[in-house]
Curated annotation (Swiss-Prot):
Protein name, entry field: Probable outer membrane protein PmpC
Biased composition (Polar residues): 268-285, 631-675, 682-703, 1303-1319
Alphabetical list of SMART domains matching this protein: Autotransporter
Organism field: Chlamydia trachomatis serovar D (strain ATCC VR-885 / DSM 19411 / UW-3/Cx)
Organism lineage string: Bacteria, Pseudomonadati, Chlamydiota, Chlamydiia, Chlamydiales
InterPro entries: Autotransporte_beta, Autotransporte_beta_dom_sf, Pectin_lyase_fold/virulence, Polymorphic_membr_middle, POMP_repeat
Keyword Amino-acid biosynthesis found: no
PROSITE patterns xref list: AUTOTRANSPORTER
Length: 1770
């Protein structure tokens, strides 16, 4: 850099100087020839000479030669243009006389201060006293706590300050360091040791620049910023071209004055001498300098010459920030290389800082905000968790840009923790990691030789001829290497990082933060926001990932190994996008765990587009006047603030020129043009900054309309610069010198063109491989890879420079040159995706994976996983059944792909979900219209797509999902094996899903074992709208399984998602619910597919499943639930039913005329073959209740246990039928059980049941009272065609064998149920280039279990049981006369009928209705029927059951017990606690009551039990000193139960009662002897109660399936009067007391009249029970005390004599017959005993707890009464 052409440097720099109006008038213009060192092309330019303020202007073409340079540019006080601050007066500095003795190091470093020792600057001017410094300028401003360093230039390092030791700023209120420039490093401050800012209130480093690095501050050690309020780094720049933008008008004037101040005595060497010295250096005479002297402007300098790193701060070690109470920000800093805000060779640590901000910084390479070679960490230690306040601190990275990786941060490891807010927004990168990049090891290391950094303090390293080059610092730059270059230290660090990363932990850690927002970041390759290896985001209260985008994979996050979200409060990820995979998240392993609240992934998109005419995105319109290109290189300039339009245009022109005549190019530019270009630059800079969008991935083009597109894509290298700029001249090799002297016109190059190449080399330094790929990640329309020539039509204009660049052996990560084969994971992409142990709800909504290849193009991409794509495993488990995850509106779609489209919401080979989920309106569609049917693959898995296994165990709801195959769940493997869809536990609902071909669930194996499974109103174009399986299926109901309303129709009128494929032929589509078809295209497999139906814990029902030729043609509907090559097995537990309201129309692969050749259908077969009585004893039911049901099952049916029920007019056609012992075949009127014509099969019936209840009243068919069921035999006529279902019903077998055969020949067998021409679907995941085709998986043929039947015969034996459970048959008036009734139709051919020991049982003698008897008519057995003879007796409305009528009367005893229980509580508790000797008081009582009464059966009464419970509230007071009066209200609820075992009926009643009571007490003395005044103390207590009791009773009669209801009321009175006397009074210190008492108790209960309802009702009259008893007893009282607690206890026993009672008598009458009588209630005996115990616990003067228990017993009755509660005294 030191020995570049002075002319080339000055030509561009000082053109700006002449634009300054402040000096223009002072300068006179003179045209002349000027001689300076170096060479250049001739061009109109303006240069400043060093004498008499004369401006010399050269016009037209001038050859420059014999240049001279000064040995040194002496410093001038640049403050001469403005007055120095008076506050600097007195500060010591070197005298002017000592200037010549200063070293060049001191003169060239430190624009204001050169410090030899530690430099400390505070707010006082005295801070500079007594410090070993060289003060070059007295212009430092000190005043009122303010310190200013501004507008200074250093020819080497430290534009304002240079320190050989530590530099410290401390205790300053306001520090302003602005517009200082260093030609090398440290625009404002350069220090060889630490730089510190401590205790500074306000610090600003603004618009400083360092050409090589450290635009603001450069430290060779570390840097510390601590205990400050606000620190600002704004508009600083690193790198030659970047520094140019720091110039302002004042700085230009100062530079002009500096140039003008060169004194003639410093020019002590002649031009000839200088030229000779220069030539000598170029010839290699100097070891230190000649290499650099010999370099032409196109040669490669050492990396440090073009460092361009650290626009704000550069440190060779670490940067530490701590204790910032306000804000530390890095705003609008620029670096032509890396780290526009901060560049540090080691770590960046920020602790206890209120706000750290990186805003609008721009880097030409990596780390637009910060580049940290090792670890960047930001944390606060004020709080340990987000729930422990205060949590302070914010980190903001916003609108930072990088042309390489990491628009915001580029580091090896990042840690953000214990913060209030983290915001990453609108950052962008031309490579990967729009906001954060942490994979430094993946950045290629250039092979460009490195040179050691020249020491700025060494005189030997300073050339003698440098002044001219140093002044023009802004433009002295050279070409950058081909790939991002790293210094040797960085290279070593990268190697160490790469080695240790294998075992490293997390490189992106964001934890314990209140709010994290990652929004609107973009990258041209991977990771729109974050790119790294491992990331963990944990303990975050709110996390938002929104609006990020990438042009490759991972629109939001891209991690090469793993990403983990742990303990997130609220997670929102929406509107992220990527071009290939992972719209929001892309990683090898994705884990979401312990999420505390709702997590949402919404409207994320993966979208790839191939267009016939590429267009720029609408959201980024081209800048006015720029040339639109088809594709733009990701590495082209996006930084409007650093883009010189004219310079970039020159670069493009030079590249296009190649080896042509550059003089023609030179003539295109003028002085005016240069000035206009500078103005355009400023306008373009502002425009680009304002118009740049956060989601933009397209570069802003240059305004020069003549530039070629390869200016964006060409990679500038050392060799390319030389070859393109020198025509025919040799490039210096191995330090060889270029030809000196005056070059020819052909060999010369314009200054601006040279500078343009230098600028391009310093900014456009991405790898060559990037230039060959299109920016847009598109899928190729052919099998060949996308190349640069195909994507960029102008790439050929790059000449040999691009062609000579070495291509890397591997494409860099994110390259889109390969053919795109997968588009997937609209929200999440990973090899393994796990979402576990979350506490809130989950939402995946509106995510999309789209192949938008336009029509006319062809795509082979697979489009998989609209919301989630997992390459190996997807696992969803909340750990709780109360958490739900919803997948709604997710989509995979394609316009033209011949690849696979699958998994509208989720795609993974293995899917495991163990939490409740909802899948709604997800879809997988392929709308390709430019492919043939053989090219287009069927989509599968509208909600879930898989190839290995799907397991759901927490319940799910699938609603309105769409796909070709498996509209809800599609499992399509490459090779048909045992891949299973398994639904376990929970409840599952499949509703209104639409299959454009087949099935809601499509899989080889389907296993359902659920509490609830409902398939409702699902639709398909072909068979099996609910389930389609190709290997095996098992459905087990633990609660309820229902298939209803499923529809197969050729027209899906409501479907708008794509055009369904048409079917060939008019084929009947049986199997509207379930269809099984062998996965074999040639049909060679001979085994049928097992389908097992198990009703173990609930019912299974098929109803209204329909095939409809057109959606509106309901008149030709066929209702069929199951079809296909299916081998059925059915099991139903006791009390459970498998119901078929639709027909079964299965087919078979078996052939032959013998029944043994066909499969066996086992009904209720025990799992243990040795067990005779199976655990499955439930019912299998076929019904025509809803519509015709003619079922055809080509199997040998064996009924092992339970019941097979054929409802009226239902037909079941099987190969053969065998009924095992203990089972039941139930047939109803009009039902048919038949064999089929395909084989010789027999019907073996043992113990048949005929249900008569479905016969309508007055129903007589052809002289018979009902249409009898039929056992039908059909001769074998087809030669064993496979048992396909018949479309027409066979005729009744009332004709001979010939007619029977004619009516049931092969023509009646109809079409095959599996006659559809569409092929079975095979795999797509493992073989994506093939269409779905059934895989030929041959399995060994198994021999069906042989049945022990005789061919084509009905063998009937055992009982024929008649049942009429509802009693409807015998209510038919047709039975009022004797007659013969046909019960069963049999074959008329006696050879086809065997009857053995038939017995008629069941309802043959009805108890109500038309009563009579039925007997078997043996004469009709040979006539093809079984008939009975009916003998009419009489008509009876009700069946007679002898009833005991005592129950209603006995309930009076329960009512009396309610009254007594309340009385006992009032006397034993409330009155016994009364203390009449105390002062007046009031009591509030709250009590709980309970009673239980049991009575054993007696000759006059039934056994019954009664119990009740209730509550009571009482209030009493002392109106007088010795009188207590109170009132109480009680409510009781009771139940009565009576079981009459011998007559098999039960009474169950319930009662509730209300009682009101008053009570009182008074002590008095009974005078025994008036003379002696001897008296007996007595206590009188009394209670009066009134009660209302309501009864409600139901009586069940199981034998006749009837019941009675009775409701009545009781009214009750109870009066009790007790007198007691103390026999023993307590002595001193003794509390024992003995009392004797007597009581008079009277009760009266009156039962009101009532009438029963329902069965044979009775009327009951009033009855009353009265009882007068005299209890007499002895009571013992005493107290226990301790720990200030007093417990008083009382125990008494009494004998109770009933002196009067009546036996209640109730009259009744049976309304139907008029019969009547009297009921005498069984009352207790007259003598009984009663025991009482009560206790009181005194808790103080106001509160008392109490309780009492009473037991009463006699010979037949036992009663328990309890009362407990609390008393409050007030």
């Amino acid at each position: 850099m030191k020995f570049m052409s002075a002319t080339a440097v000055f030509a561009a720099a000082l053109s700006s100087v002449t634009e300054a109006s402040s000096i223009q008038d002072q300068i006179k213009n003179t045209d002349c020839n000027v001689s300076k060192l170096g060479y250049s092309t001739s061009q109109a330019f303006t240069d400043m000479m060093l004498a008499d303020n004369t401006e010399y202007r050269a016009a037209d073409s001038v050859s420059f030669y014999d240049f001279s340079t000064s040995s040194r540019l002496p410093r001038k006080h640049l403050s001469s243009s403005s007055e120095a601050s008076p506050t600097t007066e007195g500060v010591s500095s070197s005298s002017s006389g000592e200037t010549d003795e200063k070293t060049e190091e001191e003169l060239d470093n430190g624009g204001i201060i050169y410090a030899r020792e530690k430099l400390t600057i505070s707010e006082s001017q005295d801070s500079l006293s007594n410090q070993s410094i060289e003060l070059h300028d007295n212009s430092i401003f000190f005043g009122e706590g303010e310190v200013i360093f501004d507008h200074r230039v250093a020819l080497k390092n430290g534009g304002a300050i240079y320190g050989e030791k530590e530099v410290v700023f401390e205790n300053i209120k306001s520090l302003l360091v602005e517009v200082n420039i260093a030609v090398e490093k440290g625009g404002s401050v350069y220090a060889k040791e630490r730089v510190s800012l401590e205790n500074v209130t306000e610090a600003t480093f603004s618009s400083n620049g360092g050409e090589q690095g450290g635009g603001g501050i450069y430290s060779e050690q570390d840097m510390l910023i601590s205990d400050c309020n606000n620190v600002h780094f704004q508009g600083n720049a690193a790198g030659a071209t970047a520094v140019k933008q720091c110039l302002d008008e004042e700085m230009i004037v100062l530079l002009a004055e500096c140039v003008d101040s060169l004194s003639e005595d410093t020019l002590d060497s002649t031009p000839e001498t200088e030229q000779t010295e220069s030539n000598g250096n170029q010839d290699g005479s100097s070891e230190t300098e000649d290499t650099q002297v010999s370099e032409s402007p196109e040669s490669t300098p050492s990396p440090d010459d073009v460092l361009g790193k650290g626009g704000g701060i550069y440190t060779e070690k670490s940067l530490t920030i701590t204790g910032i109470t306000g804000t530390i920000d890095f705003v609008s800093n620029i670096a032509t290389d890396s780290g526009a805000g901060v560049f540090t060779k080691e770590n960046l640590s920020c602790t206890n800082t209120n706000s750290l901000q990186f805003l609008k910084n721009s880097a030409g390479q990596h780390g637009g905000g910060a580049y940290v070679t090792q670890t960047m960490s930001v944390t606060n230690t004020t709080s340990e968790s987000i729930t422990t306040p205060p949590l302070i601190g914010e980190v903001i990275f916003s609108e930072n840009t990088a042309k390489g990786h990491g628009g915001g941060i580029c580091t090896n490891k990042l840690s953000l923790s214990n913060l209030k807010t983290v915001t990453l927004t609108k950052n962008s990168a031309k490579e990967s990691g729009g906001a954060i990049f942490t994979d430094l090891a993946s950045i290629p290391i250039t092979d460009t030789p490195e040179s050691s950094t020249p020491s700025s303090s060494s005189p030997a390293s300073t050339p003698e001829v440098v002044a001219s080059a140093k002044i023009n610092r802004f433009f002295a730059s050279t070409a950058k290497p081909a790939a991002p270059s790293l210094t040797e230290a960085e290279s070593d660090q990268t190697d160490q990082t790469e080695t240790s990363d294998t075992n490293s932990d997390i490189d992106v850690s964001i934890e314990n933060i209140l709010n994290v927002a990652i929004n609107q970041n973009t990258s041209a390759k991977k990771g729109g926001a974050i790119y790294g290896k491992k990331a963990k985001l944990s303990r975050i209260n709110n996390l938002e990932l929104s609006g990020n985008s990438s042009q490759d994979v991972g629109g939001g996050l891209c991690l090469t190994e793993s990403v983990e979200f742990d303990a997130i409060g609220s997670l929102l990820s929406h509107y992220n996008s990527a071009a290939k995979e992972g719209g929001a998240i892309h990683s090898k392993t994705v884990t979401l765990s312990n999420l505390k609240s709702t997590f949402t992934f919404a409207d994320n998109t993966v979208k790839a587009i191939v267009e016939s005419t590429p267009e720029a995105p609408e959201e980024i319109p081209p800048v006015e006047g720029e040339e639109s290109t088809a594709t733009e290189d990701p590495n082209s300039n996006t930084e409007g603030s650093s883009a010189n339009t004219n310079l970039e245009g020159s670069q493009g022109d030079t590249a296009d020129t190649g080896t042509g005549d550059v003089n023609n190019e030179s003539q295109d530019t003028s002085d005016t043009g240069n000035a206009e270009s500078e103005e355009q630059l400023q306008d373009s800079t502002q425009s680009n900054e304002e118009n740049t969008l956060p989601n933009s991935n397209i570069d802003q083009s240059n305004e020069n309309t003549d530039e070629s597109s390869d200016s964006h894509t060409e990679e500038i290298t050392d060799e390319s610069v030389s070859s393109s700029s020198e025509s025919g001249s040799s490039t210096p090799q191995d330090g060889g010198a270029a030809s000196s002297g005056a070059p020819s016109g052909d060999q010369s190059i314009s200054a601006n063109a040279c500078l343009a190449k230098s600028y391009a080399a310093s900014t456009d330094s991405s790898p060559v491989s990037n230039s060959s790929g299109s920016e847009e990640p598109v899928t190729s329309s052919s099998d060949s890879d996308v190349t640069a020539s195909s994507d960029n039509p102008d790439s050929s204009s790059s000449g040999d420079s691009a062609g000579d660049s070495e291509e890397p052996t591997e494409p860099e990560a994110g390259s889109t040159t390969e053919t795109l084969t997968l588009i997937g994971g609209g929200a999440i992409y990973g090899e393994t995706v796990k979402i576990e142990n979350f506490s809130g709800q989950g939402i995946f909504s509106g995510n999309k994976a789209i192949d938008n290849t336009t029509e006319g193009s062809s795509s082979k991409s697979d489009v998989l996983g609209g919301a989630v794509y997992a390459k190996t495993l997807f696992n969803l488990d909340s750990g709780s059944s109360r958490r739900t995850v919803t997948f709604s509106g997710n989509t995979v779609s394609s316009q033209s792909t011949t690849g696979q489209v699958a998994g509208g919401a989720i795609y993974s080979p293995t899917v495991t979900i163990a939490t409740p989920v909802v899948f709604s309106k997800n879809s997988a569609t392929n709308n390709a219209n430019n492919t043939t049917d053989t090219q287009r693959k069927d989509t599968f898995g509208g909600a879930i797509g898989a190839t290995s296994a799907v397991s759901l165990s927490g319940g799910a709801h699938f609603l309105e999902n769409v796909a070709d195959l498996g509209s809800a769940i599609g499992l399509v493997p490459g090779t048909q094996n045992t891949e299973t869809v398994k639904l376990e536990s929970g409840s599952y609902y499949f509703e209104k899903n639409k299959a454009l071909k087949r099935a809601t669930i499509y899989a080889p194996v389907v296993s359902i074992k659920a509490y609830t499974a409902t398939f409702n109103q699902n639709r398909s174009l072909e068979e099996g709208s609910a389930i389609y399986f190709t290997k095996e299926a098992s459905i087990e109901s633990l609660g309820s399984v229902l298939f209803t309303g499923n529809l197969v129709t050729l027209t899906l009128s409501t479907t708008t998602e794509g055009t369904p494929a048409t079917t060939s032929g008019d084929v009947t589509k049986y199997g509207a619910a379930i269809f099984g078809q062998i996965a074999s295209s040639n049909g060679s497999q001979t085994d049928n597919l097992p389908l097992k139906l198990i009703a173990s814990g609930g019912n299974i029902c098929f109803r209204n499943n329909e095939y409809r030729p057109t959606s509106s043609d309901t008149g030709t509907s066929t209702f069929c639930s199951i079809a296909g090559d299916v081998k059925l097995t059915m099991q139903a537990a006791k009390g459970k039913t498998i119901s078929f309201f639709d027909a079964i129309r299965t087919s078979t692969k078996k052939t032959g005329t013998q029944a043994t050749a066909y499969d066996t259908l086992d009904i209720n077969k025990s799992e243990d073959s040795e067990t005779v009585n199976s655990a499955f004893t439930g019912t299998i039911l076929f019904s025509s209740e809803l519509h015709e049901n003619k079922s055809y099952i080509p199997q040998n049916v064996v009924l092992h246990s339970g019941s097979l029920v054929l409802k009226p007019n239902t037909e079941l056609h099987v190969i053969s039928f065998e009924q095992k012992e203990g089972s039941s075949l139930v047939m109803t009127p009009g039902s048919v059980l038949s064999n089929q014509t395909v084989a010789d099969g027999a019907l073996v019936i043992n113990n048949m049941t005929i249900d008569l209840s479905s016969v309508e009243k007055n129903g007589i068919a052809e002289g018979n009272i009902f249409t009898p069921p039929e056992l039908r035999i059909i001769d074998t006529t087809t030669g064993g065609s496979g048992g396909t279902p018949s479309t027409d019903s066979e005729s009744n077998q009332n004709s001979d064998d010939t007619e029977e055969q004619n009516n049931n020949d092969a023509s009646n067998q109809g079409e095959s149920a599996n006659g559809s021409s569409s092929p079975a679907v095979a795999a797509a995941h493992t073989s994506r280039t093939r269409n779905f085709a059934a895989a030929a998986t041959a399995t060994p043929t198994t021999t069906p279990t042989a049945t022990t039947t005789t061919s084509n015969q009905v063998i009937l034996g055992g009982e024929i049981k008649l049942i009429d459970p509802n009693g409807t048959f015998f209510q038919n008036p047709a039975l009022r006369s004797d007659q013969q009734i046909s019960l069963l139709v049999l074959p008329t051919d006696s050879s086809k009928m065997q009857a053995q020991k038939i017995v008629l049982t069941g309802d043959i003698a009805p108890q109500k209705g038309y009563t009579g008897t039925l007997t078997l008519d043996p004469d009709q057995l040979q006539n093809g029927t079984i008939s009975v003879l009916w003998k009419f007796d009489s008509y009876r409305q009700w069946a007679y059951v002898p009833r005991d009528n005592h129950f209603y009367a006995n309930s009076i005893l329960g009512s009396q017990m309610l009254m007594v229980t309340v009385k006992q509580g009032l006397l034993n508790d409330k009155m016994n606690l009364a203390r009449f000797e105390e002062v007046s008081y009031n009591n509030l009582w709250i009590s709980g009551l309970g009673t239980m009464l049991s009575q054993v059966g007696t000759p006059t009464s039934e056994e019954f039990t009664y119990y009740s419970r209730g509550a009571s509230v009482a209030l009493d007071a002392k109106p007088a000193h010795d009188v207590i009066v109170g009132a109480a209200f009680s409510k009781m609820i009771g139940k009565t139960k009576s079981l009459k075992r011998e007559n098999n009926y039960t009474h169950k009643g319930s009662e509730y009662s209300y009682q009101a009571s008053v009570y009182g007490g008074k002590p008095f003395h009974f005078v025994i002897n008036k003379k002696t005044e001897k008296s007996l103390p007595l206590l009188l207590q009394g209670v009066i109660s009134y009660g209302y009791i309501k009864h409600d009773t139901v009586t069940h009669y199981p034998t006749i399936r009837e019941r009675n209801k009775g409701e009545w009321e009781d009214l009750g009175w109870l009066t009790a009067l007790r007198v007691s006397s103390v026999l023993r009074t307590p002595a001193q210190g003794d509390t024992k007391r003995i009392t004797v008492y007597g009581e008079l108790e009277y009760s009266s209960i009156r039962q009101k009249q009532f009438t029963e309802t329902e069965y044979d009702p009775r009327y009951f009259d009033n009855c009353t029970y009265r009882n007068l008893a005299i209890p007499m007893g002895l009571a013992f009282e005493g107290e226990l005390s301790g720990n200030d607690i007093l417990m008083y206890n009382r125990f008494s026993v009494a004998y109770m004599l009933s002196i009067y009672r009546n036996s209640p008598t109730c009259k009744y009458q049976v309304l139907s017959s008029g019969e009547g009588g009297e009921i005498i209630c069984g009352v207790p005996t007259r003598n009984s005993a009663r025991g009482e115990y009560s206790t009181q616990l005194y808790l103080g003067p106001l509160w008392t707890l109490y309780g009492s228990y009473t037991i009463e017993a006699d010979a037949h009755t036992l009663a328990h009464m309890m009362n407990c509660g609390a008393r409050m005294t007030f």
